Regions:
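ABC family nucleotide-binding domain
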Residues: 24-260, 266
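ABC-family P-loop ATPase nucleotide-binding domain
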Residues: 1-35
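C-terminal boundary and immediately downstream tail of ABC-type ATPase nucleotide-binding domains
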Residues: 2, 247, 259-278
Length: 278
């Protein structure tokens, strides 16, 4: 399903459309006829959609509708059953060669996924490393950044997420919300072109959720990173998204501007889902 044309809508003063994505003609993310099966169970059923450069798109829908699977396919944490995924017009895991669908070699896939960062439900910080070491580990060992530069960058990111004073502490000394903010800084340290957010507040105590969402709002407002977001925080989705896609049964049943989806949904499944959670 292509990106929705929002026509002559007039976004409000705090609308994400104030920082609308650029459009150079090549989608940052493209799913073409994507199918994902686990055994006999089809999780994604012939999925087609694009995400433009700098666009922030939130995926909503009931559990089991395929939202997290989309993120995991982009990170190559799951194998694609059928179809193609493209990043900046380049194949992520498979390409057509002489009319045949051929899997790319692991080295090529690894190079492609360096463009993508992901923040998971569970923060999974290394317990034996300090906060700043958790953030510098990948830039030093994957990108080849020197340790001093990596530390300077990490401290800047910790400042951005409000945790600079925790730099030399271990994760066990931090609350769940603080650990998730470190995980966000860790993902940003790799300078991703695309940031995937998978229910990043679902494992947190309710009083810690706002701090994490405020950090993500700041990231959305201050960067041009393309973001694909899975969340049940509907106000957050409304605040930061350029588009919202509603999933059910591994298919997109509605795709539109946040105000359209949340105030005047057209699909009955969308209406039922939103009535249940709002």
């Amino acid at each position: 399903m292509p990106s929705t044309d929002h026509g002559d809508e007039r976004p409000g003063p705090h609308s994400p459309q104030d920082s609308a994505p650029s459009d150079d003609g090549t989608p940052t993310i493209e799913f073409r006829d994507v199918v994902k099966r686990f055994g006999d169970h089809t999780v994604l059923d012939g999925l087609n959609f694009t995400v433009g450069r700098g666009e922030r798109v939130t995926l909503i829908g009931p559990s089991g509708s395929g939202k997290t699977t989309i993120l995991r396919l982009l990170m190559t944490l799951e194998d694609l059953t059928e179809g193609f995924i493209l990043v900046d017009g380049e194949p992520l895991t498979h390409e057509l060669r002489n009319g045949r669908r051929v899997e790319l070699p692991p080295k090529r896939k690894k190079q492609m996924t360096r463009r993508i960062g992901m923040v998971f439900q569970q923060f999974n910080l290394f317990p034996n490393m300090t906060v700043v070491q958790n953030i510098t580990e990948a830039p030093v060992n994957v990108l080849g950044m020197d340790k001093a530069s990596a530390r300077d960058k990490a401290l800047g990111l910790l400042r951005q997420v409000g945790l600079e004073e925790k730099a030399d502490q271990h994760p066990s000394r931090l609350s769940g919300g603080q650990q998730q903010r470190v995980a966000i800084a860790r993902a940003l340290a790799m300078d991703p072109e695309i940031l995937l957010l998978d229910e990043v507040t679902s494992a947190l105590d309710p009083e810690l959720v706002d701090d994490v969402l405020n950090v993500l709002r700041d990231v959305a407002e201050s960067t041009d990173i393309t973001m694909l977001i899975v969340t049940h925080e509907m106000q957050f989705a409304r605040d930061v998204s350029h588009r919202v896609m509603m999933f059910d049964g591994g298919r997109i049943v509605e795709d539109g501007h946040p105000e359209e989806i949340f105030t005047d949904p057209k699909n009955e499944r969308t209406k039922t889902f939103l009535r249940a959670i709002l």
